[in-house]
Amino acid sequence: QHYDAAMSDAFFDDLGMPKPNVYLGVGSGSHAIQTAKVMTEFEPIVLEHKPDWVVVVGDVNSTIACALVCSKLGIKVAHVEAGLRSRDRSMPEEINRILTDSISDLLLTTSQDADENLASEGIPSQKIRFVGNVMIDSLLEHLKIAERSTIREDLGVPDTDYAVLTLHRPSNVDDRAIFSGILGSLIAISERLPIIFPVHPRTKAKIEEFGFKDSINDSNIRLIEPLGYLDFTRLYSGA
């Protein structure tokens, strides 16, 4: 739900992954619009290829949209990162997780507590498989490569004593009062510890909308463009 073309391309390039064979062209939008568009664009692909299984990953709008399409067509769904719960139903991701798990045929989990969450929700044990955390696998696979990045030198950040910030969840940045409170705390922290802030496009738009740019510029928070996977890994590993 936070799609940005430049950020998406950077991940494929950094991780050495082939570009998608099919691009649905949905982009950003409200939760309802994005979910509906993914469903209407994805269904013809499924009808054409007639897969036995479809694998969906994570907790974003495309996850639940594709799972719904397959469930209605009688195609089996495997959900990677199943069973994760925040217990906060105000989060769009939490709704996506719960609904996707409830209609998936194979639930691939990252941790024991995810298994326990699914069991407590009545998911049969034969549907649950603990497979580990693909995000950690990716990190370990690319950590040595990320060490070659020159991002810290390019930005001129010190070897130690700096923080890295990410902030983009709607619950944190869409409400002016909430965002202002978070920003006030960050500005106070930046007086003791400089903060490097790769700004997500939707957060950047909210900073402009709420008139926070001057406050940030007057602080020790440094705004930079979003980073690719390897540069970001190098940056936060030294923070």
Question: Would you name each region that the model predicts?
Answer:
Residues 2-6, 25, 103-178:
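A nucleotide-sugar donor-handling region in carbohydrate enzymes
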Residues 1-3, 108, 195-201:
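Short internal beta-strands
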Residues 1-21:
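Small-residue-rich anion-binding loops in enzyme active sites
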Residues 11, 23-122:
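Active-site and donor-binding regions of nucleotide-sugar-utilizing enzymes
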Residues 9-11, 17, 147-238:
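Donor-nucleotide binding loops and adjacent catalytic segments primarily
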Residues 104, 238-239:
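An anion/phosphate-binding loop that grips the pyrophosphate of nucleotide cofactors and donors
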Residues 82-86, 133, 221, 226-229:
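Short, acidic/turn-prone active-site loops that include or flank metal/cofactor-
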Residues 21, 128, 220-222:
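Short, conserved active-site loop motifs that form the nucleotide-linked donor/cofactor pocket
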